[in-house]
Amino acid sequence: MLLGVNIDHIAVLRQARMVNDPDLLEAAFIVARHGDQITLHVREDRRHAQDFDLENIIKFCKSPVNLECALNDEILNLALKLKPHRVTLVPEKREELTTEGGLCLNHAKLKQSIEKLQNANIEVSLFINPSLEDIEKSKILKAQFIELHTGHYANLHNALFSNISHTAFALKELDQDKKTLQAQFEKELQNLELCAKKGLELGLKVAAGHGLNYKNVKPVVKIKEICELNIGQSIVARSVFTGLQNAILEMKELIKR
């Protein structure tokens, strides 16, 4: 299984003081040596990664670069100019802390944007909710890749197996008894497996990501139809204590098949 390391949160730390420390390019070099892919989300508001980050990483790093971006003309034109290995189209809201759900596949610009990117020899992935309907739509749209949103799975795992319910970060909608949460967790994991199988049946390559960490990743790794995971925040958080290289290698060991 391949590991794409999302380095957005290193850019968040840099932007907190508006200095070039930590250096995002240095982080990209470490990912290039120890991971399989560099993933970077250039948001419309440029709250963390900047255009020059993408340009420098593509220019100086040999690893594949996976650009996450919304259906924004300015950023799509940047992608067409710089030509990352892959563009993963994601939904985006300015007020959100992180991507809250999968892409709406009924967007009028979506088909045209996919065609433009593919005509420039850029692989296209769609970040979608794990639903059979969205997978079938992704095939119709002729995407080569899909990335299944694992946020709900991760939230359920947290509610079941961590102390988050006793903290300020508890989710009200998951304030339920353990038996109910366990049933929901098992159902969501089965749904991820069903969707991954459907994607592969339709000839799509299947990735997964969002909220995955060192404690919840193993059940997802067992879904053999998923070929790649994109993980960021948990690796960067771990790197505060272990260093980025070790944090990546620890995750690589966990996802080894």
UniProtKB/Swiss-Prot annotation:
GO cellular component, as recorded: cytosol
Residue numbers binding 1-deoxy-D-xylulose 5-phosphate: 8-9, 43, 48, 98
Annotated site, Transition state stabilizer, chain positions: 147
Pathway: Cofactor biosynthesis; pyridoxine 5'-phosphate biosynthesis; pyridoxine 5'-phosphate from D-erythrose 4-phosphate: step 5/5
One GO term of the biological process aspect: pyridoxine biosynthetic process
A Pfam family matched in the record: PdxJ
Protein's UniProt keywords contain Phosphoprotein: no
Reaction(s) the record says it catalyses: 3-amino-2-oxopropyl phosphate + 1-deoxy-D-xylulose 5-phosphate = pyridoxine 5'-phosphate + phosphate + 2 H2O + H(+)
Enzyme class: transferase
Gene3D superfamilies assigned to the protein according to its UniProt record, in alphabetical order: Aldolase class I (3.20.20.70)
EC number: 2.6.99.2
An example molecular function term from Gene Ontology annotations: pyridoxine 5'-phosphate synthase activity
Keyword Signal tagged: no
Chief site of localization: cytoplasm
InterPro entries: Aldolase_TIM, PyrdxlP_synth_PdxJ, Pyridoxine-5'_phos_synth
Classification via NCBIfam families: pdxJ, PRK05265.1-3, PRK05265.1-5
Subunit-level organization: Homooctamer; tetramer of dimers.
Family label: Belongs to the PNP synthase family.
Protein name: Pyridoxine 5'-phosphate synthase
